[in-house]
Swiss-Prot record:
Keyword Calcium: yes
Task of the protein: Arrestin is one of the major proteins of the ros (retinal rod outer segments); it binds to photoactivated-phosphorylated rhodopsin, thereby apparently preventing the transducin-mediated activation of phosphodiesterase.
Gene Ontology BP, a term: G protein-coupled receptor internalization
Alphabetical list of InterPro entries matching this protein: Arrestin (IPR000698), Arrestin-like_C (IPR014752), Arrestin-like_N (IPR011021), Arrestin_C-like (IPR011022), Arrestin_CS (IPR017864), Arrestin_N (IPR014753), Ig_E-set (IPR014756)
Protein name, as recorded: S-arrestin
SMART domains documented for this protein: Arrestin_C
GO molecular function terms noted in the UniProt entry: G protein-coupled receptor binding
Length: 396
């Protein structure tokens, strides 16, 4: 057994059916740092003999899917492109400046027919997010996804064929901020009819940012100076997905819940710490819950909170996700349960993944490349209708 402990770096590769074009990417997840976004940097390898004088282009697309693309309603597809960019890679029209180490090593390994490309995201695009479909809607999609495509054509006016193109799904993601905001705390008072003094509710969290899979504790204090009895206290994590396309729709779903049936009598004080754990595992049957975008055959989690660059309009098209803790008191009325009322307060918080250790890769030059092919069946569900027809013809 070899004693070589050299680390390995995965390179994602996909080749067109006609073998003329191959795309190499060093990663599939591109990080939105709020102030800037990682560019999509890769390498295209071409076979000039198979291209027969054709040019090679690379495109970057952000699309909003909101239905089953197999169905075409009066000529309308269930897809809207939010962003599209294109560049000619071969023959190169301009040199790519400041190549990454991965690009440099790939070009050295692949030889003279390797050409680098860099494409940038604008700062207003949403991250990769989808809405969980109902169990009966397996083939339907609603969400934002990103795609890198390379294709060969004599010119841009010509319609290229599926066999001359390569499509790779990527993700745009965000990580938890380095400097979280102040600790969330909220309080409210409620004056009841025929009570001289109010009911006071205070709720607080230990911090603003929680990671996926982390338990959230909510400290609740009820100071009941009124003549009413608090019959129940409940806490919940509510996810709000703002879906902005042709209109602005809000989907609010409860993704975690805890309650106490202990009564708070008049002229008394009650303190309790509630525990909440928002996980997709507990919500797989709930429709329209927002999830982080996923690549085929991979699991995902509840969608991360959306962080926007200062000055960016929140009506940007896509799906924006927010979380809050809602604390609700159920208070008895004059006629008992028939006239119960509720007192509530809310605590906004952030739910995200932690930022990976930036020092994990110090010597990229010492790494071996491991090439991982993008499986063609991974993208089969994502093909547009006309492309599916072409693929079926190619397979005959």
């Amino acid at each position: 057994m070899s004693g070589d402990k050299k680390s390995r770096s995965v390179i994602y590769k996909k080749t067109s059916r006609d073998k003329a074009v191959s795309v190499y990417l060093g990663k599939r997840d591109y990080v939105d740092h709020i102030e800037s976004v990682d560019p999509v940097d890769g390498v295209v390898f071409v076979d000039p003999d198979l291209l027969k004088g054709k040019k090679v282009y690379v495109t970057l697309t952000c699309a909003f899917r909101y239905g089953n693309e197999d169905i075409d309603v009066i000529g309308l597809t269930f897809r809207k492109d939010l962003f599209f960019a294109r560049t000619q890679v071969y023959p190169p029209v301009e040199d790519v400046k400041c190549l990454t180490k991965v690009q440099e090593r790939l070009m050295k390994k692949l030889g003279n027919n390797a050409y680098p490309f860099v494409m940038a995201f604008p700062d207003y695009l949403p991250c990769s997010v989808s809405l969980q479909p109902a169990l009966s809607d397996v083939n339907k999609a609603c969400g934002v996804d990103f795609e890198v495509k390379a294709f060969s054509a004599s010119n841009l006016e010509d319609r290229y064929h599926k066999k001359n193109s390569v499509r790779l799904l990527i993700r745009k993601i965000q990580y938890a901020p380095d400097q979280p905001g102040p600790t969330p705390r909220a309080e409210t008072s409620w004056q009841f009819f025929m009570s001289d003094k109010p009911l006071h509710l205070t709720a607080s969290l230990a911090k603003e940012v929680f990671y996926h899979g982390e338990t959230i504790t909510v400290a609740v204090t009820v100071t009941n100076s009124s003549e009413k009895t608090v019959k129940k206290i409940s806490t919940s994590v509510e996810q709000t997905a703002n879906v902005v396309l042709y209109s602005s729709d809000f989907y609010t779903k409860t993704v975690a819940f805890d309650e106490s049936d202990e009564k708070v009598s008049p002229k008394s004080t009650y303190k309790h710490t509630f525990t909440l754990l928002p996980l997709l595992a507990y919500n797989r049957e709930k429709r329209e819950i927002a999830l982080d975008g996923k690549l085929k055959h991979e699991d995902t989690n509840l969608a991360s909170s959306t962080l926007l660059k200062e000055g960016i309009d929140r009506t940007v098209m896509g799906i924006l996700v927010d979380y809050k803790i809602k604390v609700t008191l159920t208070v008895s009325g004059l006629l008992g349960d028939m006239t119960s009322s509720e007192v509530s307060t809310e605590l906004p918080f952030i739910l995200m993944h932690p930022k990976p250790d930036s020092g994990a890769k110090e010597s990229e030059q010492e790494e071996d490349f491991v090439f991982e092919d993008f499986a063609r069946d991974q993208l089969k569900d994502e093909l547009q209708p006309e492309e599916k027809e072409e693929e079926e013809e190619d397979e005959k």
